[in-house]
Structure formats: structure tokens, C-alpha cells
Amino acid sequence: MVNLFHGDCLDILPTLADDSVNLVLVDLPYGTTACKWDSIIPLDKLWEQYNRICKEDGAMVFTAAQPFTTILAASNLENLRYEWIWEKPQGTNPMNAKVMPLKSHENILVFYRKKPTYNPQMWYSTPYSGFSSETSKIGEVYRSEEHTSELQSH
């Protein structure tokens, strides 16, 4: 079952039960314009609520654009896992075209405490040749998720 809420998140989030949400999918204000609605919401208050309502293996997914992407990522390095790039077919923000390039992508930041269910979307392609996952040591260069909290302490 999907429940959608429309309103101020700082009013709605406290009404949700603890550990009741599988996915938080959010497009917060980025604070990149002078518009009243584009004010950055206090991230510490949001994280307090998101961590309370999200199940232990729930995911918190945010759309963002620079410089907000960096602010958002730095606000919760402990739970930041990866970033996707949302490539757009046409650049946006034409009002600033004379002073900066059009924005052709947005960032999608994924946070979680415990690995959520992940169902990879496969596509048809030609298999790699010359090595296999059983003989390749490429996976050994990546650190585990637990290492992220070690980075926090330095």
C-alpha cells in the first residue's frame, strides 16, 4: 500500500509511526533561487524524523543539485551510500544561460542504515570475456559499508 501526503514535512513527519516507512523519496528545496519556497529545510530536524520513521532496512532517496548536493551529502555521511546521476534530455535553468551553462543533470543521493532490498535492472549485452567474478579481484578494492563510519571518526 502506498500513502502519499501533501503538506509541510515538518508538520507531517511527527505524525508518522516509528519504523513504519520503507522508502523516503524526497525532492527538497535546494536553496538555489531567491524564491520564498526554495529555502533549505533544517536538515538536522529532517534526519531526526527520517531515521525515526524509516525501517532499519529502509532507503532515503533525495534529488539534489549543486551546491545543495554537497550540503545534503555532508549532513549524513554515516548513512550516505551512493549517488546516481539523473541525466536530462534537455538542459534546464535557461534564465541563467548568459552567465552559466544549462544544467543537464541532477544528483540523486541514496542513504540507508542497513542494506535495503535491491532488485537490479538487467539489460541485454555482450558478456565480458577474459575474466569472471570468481577469478577477478576487482571487488577487493572497494571498502565495506561499515568503513563509512570509520571515515566519520577521522
Map each language-model feature to its residues:
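Core catalytic lobe of class I
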Residues: 1-149, 153
